[in-house]
Amino acid sequence: MTKLTPMMRQYLDIKAQYPDAILFFRLGDFYEMFMEDAVTASRILDITLTSRNKGAAEEVPLCGIPYHSCQPYVARLVEAGHKVAICEQVEDPKTVKGIVKREVVRVVTPGLVVDADTLTPKENNFLAAIAVSAQERYGIAVLDITTGEFRVTEVEGREAACSEVVSLQPREILVSEDQQQFCEQLLQGASGSWLINPLPDWVCDLEACGQRLQSFFNCGSLESFGCARLPEAVRAAGGVVYYVEQTQKGVAGHIRPLVTYHSRDYMVLDNSTRRNLELTATLQDGGRKGSLLGVLDRTVTAMGGRKIRQWIHHPLVDLKAIRDRHLSVQELVGQSLVRGDLRADLDGVYDLERLNSKIAMGHANAKDLVALRKSFEKLPRILQHLDELSAPLAAGIGSRIDPLTDMAELIGRAIVEDPPFVLREGGLMCDGYHLELDELRDIRRNGKEWIAKLEADERERTGIGSLKVRFNKVFGYYIEVTRTHLGRVPEDYQRKQTLANAERFFTPQLKEYEEKVLGAEDRLFDLEFELFQDLRERVAEQGERVQRTAEALAELDVLLSLADVAHSCDYVCPTMDDSDRLVIRDGRHPVIEAMNLGEHFVPNDVEMDCRENQIMVITGPNMAGKSTYMRQVALITLMAHMGSLVPAASAHIGLVDRIFTRVGASDNLAQGQSTFMVEMTEAAHILNHATSRSLIVLDEIGRGTSTFDGISIAWAVAEYLHDNGHVAAKTLFATHYHELTDLILTCERVKNLNIAVREWNEQIIFLRKIVKGPASHSYGIQVARLAGLPVAVIDRAKEILVNLESGELAEEGQPRLAQRAGGGQHRPNPQMSLFDAAADPVREKLAALDISTISPLEGLNFLHELQKLV
């Protein structure tokens, strides 16, 4: 460009500081974007692209949006993967000569979206940072700037790190430049959508990070945060603080003290387990409906919705904490009236965590304060209802809830019931809140009346009947007296202008009024905004009280949600202890039962321990319910550990430290792994990390290779789990390899189970009931028929199966698969012979019975015998 205006020079100087962000440059009532930013933004936002210097040789692309409605536009740009730098006018244009000073006040990134209205209410919006040592210890820090939650942990190994990151689902991940490629490889193929941002290596220096954290939290040591001896955690948390300080420009005072958590405090769930058990999203479409969260989440606040997600992803392993949750949920199930009242009151509580953060960052409007006030007004009733409960956890929650009546009264006195969104156009504050504001409003509303009254008062005081009070734009307000009455003018009148036939005066009272009325409109709006800012700061000073209350309400909301589900779905309180037992009577799959698919859900038992019933080998046809049964056991176990009641007639569950699942498999082309390689990698992870307190769900092992290889690997895996005392984990092992049912011959803690099936008119009926013993047939061809394979294919499959099962061989010793049944007749299909007439004692007894010779009593006895045989 040959010649730049002062404004464009200012723009380019600021843009140079934020080259990786789209710059929203404030010009009056608009944010303008120029050059490449304008081209990019206009395309994403679908707004008009125009230009400055239109028609000139060097046009400057330009687009803009109204400043007061910018948030949806910012959200769309961030969703598209861009950062947005918000550049504001930091001087009043009315008081400045020349160019107005402008500064970037914040940078919005995927992990630092501060406008909660554009976020999913019941999900956190985490910014994460990862630091890794040469020994592969990973520090992981996460911050939700919209709630102030700041947590950090250290884990060991790639699998644990990847699993933790996936459970948090951050929107943005910070890494040092030298570790960026390593972390990208770590998370390759993981289920999640995030932006990875590199930080300069010096930012992640351990000493610098420690000092940065101490400065940020104004403390002399990190000991109180529990991370002083966790160097990678300190580096990760220090990276987060650096990024926040660089982008948020000193408005992060609401961030809570750093909380260090450890994996040993929670049940370990790897990424595969979270995905396969569909804890918070389904495998089919990633939706919430059809997941465990979709069933258990009946929370009525956004805070509770985020909290229950955390509880599901991080089940407890501390018996006392688990029992406290169970006792509270159980009491709330029984106290239906109290439960209903509490849920009704909580339903009127807004998202206090995010409102509190908006206020602390100076982004809250008057409607946000009204929402805060309405929420505070619910607290005394909530505390009153909590007094009716006796469970220790409920009492603890009550002690953490601050009624905040002083804040509710303050906001109620200050802010009108239905304030406008815009803060600088008045109408925010209540009458009677501030004396000067009331006077300015009175002047604005009653200016003519005041002038008329002053005129009448002065006429009476002076006795001049023709005295007039007038106004013009040149001289302002004045009192006009004709020359014939100048002798009656009081001493306090001061001459302002002389005319041919009159004199114009002012008094101190009129001068004061003039100053008030001429500046009343601007002063009114400015004062009201100042008063609002002052009020917002006063509320922000109480942020810690609000945070504590919000945390307690979120926990209460989760307990109420679990109680509501337990009551309506007939859940029971499990017995939990430190044993190795896992006994569930009439257990039900919580999600499938709730989906009401038109089929009565058949409950099933499980009885496992590490002494006699360690490994359950489950056989049966596809679609019979093996996977449902195993997932059901895993979900009930997880629910018990998170503090929920469980779908069963009764349950006795010893503490479980980990749940592993290996369910199905598919190619991982991104990492160059075949189906079989994925399967073996998952199996290796289980065998290397399981303990005697773990629960393992294996749904098919060895399917991705040849039959003999698959059987060999599956057998060896089962033996390893059985024979190695340091593993010896309770295992549910579903398989189509019927050879594995012979494990009971060599492994004393292996038991066989199968899914009951019945035949009827060459159709199979899935009874969905788990019974002892191995399955007699796989019924694969019948399942293929149910799937809709052509009749010709089904018939041909039967012929081939006959050849295989009869052992017919060709001359070269291979199975004679091509052999067809002679004479166009199909051979009988042994796969369908559940009721072989030659071997079925029920058929034999029925065939030998002469019903004409027996009495009714003998008939009943005979039926009783048959029933025992069946």
From Swiss-Prot:
The lineage's top-level taxon is Bacteria
Q: Which SUPFAM superfamilies match?
A: DNA repair protein MutS, domain I (SSF55271), DNA repair protein MutS, domain II (SSF53150), DNA repair protein MutS, domain III (SSF48334), P-loop containing nucleoside triphosphate hydrolases (SSF52540)
Residues that coordinate or bind ATP: G620, P621, N622, M623, A624, G625, K626, S627
Which InterPro entries does the entry mention? DNA_mismatch_repair_MutS, DNA_mismatch_repair_MutS-lik_N, DNA_mismatch_repair_MutS/MSH, DNA_mismatch_repair_MutS_C, DNA_mismatch_repair_MutS_clamp, DNA_mismatch_repair_MutS_core, DNA_mismatch_repair_MutS_N, DNA_mismatch_repair_MutS_sf
Example of a GO cellular component annotation carried by this entry: cytosol
User: Gene3D superfamilies of this UniProt entry?
Assistant: 1.10.1420.10, DNA repair protein MutS, domain I (3.40.1170.10), MutS, connector domain (3.30.420.110), P-loop containing nucleotide triphosphate hydrolases (3.40.50.300)
Q: Name one GO biological process term.
A: mismatch repair
> Which keywords does UniProt give here?
ATP-binding, DNA damage, DNA repair, DNA-binding, Nucleotide-binding
MF term (GO), any: ATP binding
CDD domains xref list? ABC_MutS1
What does the protein in this record do?
A: This protein is involved in the repair of mismatches in DNA. It is possible that it carries out the mismatch recognition step. This protein has a weak ATPase activity.
The cross-references to NCBIfam families, in alphabetical order and at most eight, read: mutS1, PRK05399.1
Please report which protein family the annotation says this sequence is part of: Belongs to the DNA mismatch repair MutS family.
Which protein are we looking at?
DNA mismatch repair protein MutS
Q: Which species does this protein come from?
A: Syntrophotalea carbinolica (strain DSM 2380 / NBRC 103641 / GraBd1)
Gene assigned in the entry = mutS
